[in-house]
Design a protein with these regions (language model features):
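Rossmann-like AdoMet
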Residues: 1-130
Length: 131
């Protein structure tokens, strides 16, 4: 068995995979977005700056923000959306957030949480190739 296949099974096997069987709220590790909203706020500020550099006629009707590997919390997307909603209403209006996570249960949890907070803004799919 190649390492790639072993890792695929270890992480995503439907019955034994780490990301498909562990849905508890106590993670084994934390990433930068889980420490607080600071990374998301910084990214949102930079997105706002980039948005304002575009001439109005060049600003896209739909601006897609994609978080790959969002997990069950989608903390990064949440803090970006909160910041844009408060500080960049023009960009927020045109924005759609797409959450990607291969674990469908985790993706469903994230979509449920963010869809309630940001109606009609958050979408999801388990496969990056589907975007």
């Amino acid at each position: 068995m190649e390492f790639r296949d072993w890792m695929e099974d270890a992480l995503y096997d439907k019955e034994r995979g780490y990301y498909t069987t562990r849905l508890d709220s106590i993670p084994d590790y934390v990433t930068a977005p889980n420490f607080g909203p600071y990374l998301g706020q910084t990214i949102a500020r930079e997105l706002g700056r980039a948005w304002h550099l575009l001439p109005t006629h060049a600003q896209p009707q739909v601006f897609s923000l994609v978080e790959v590997g969002c997990g069950s919390q989608a903390s990064l997307t949440r803090s970006i959306l909160e910041t844009l909603q408060a500080n960049e209403p023009g960009l927020y209006c045109n924005l759609q957030a797409i959450l990607v996570d291969r674990s469908v249960p985790r993706l469903s949890q994230a979509l449920d949480k963010l869809s309630r907070a940001f109606p009609n803004k958050v979408f999801g799919c388990p496969d990056m190739a589907q975007i």
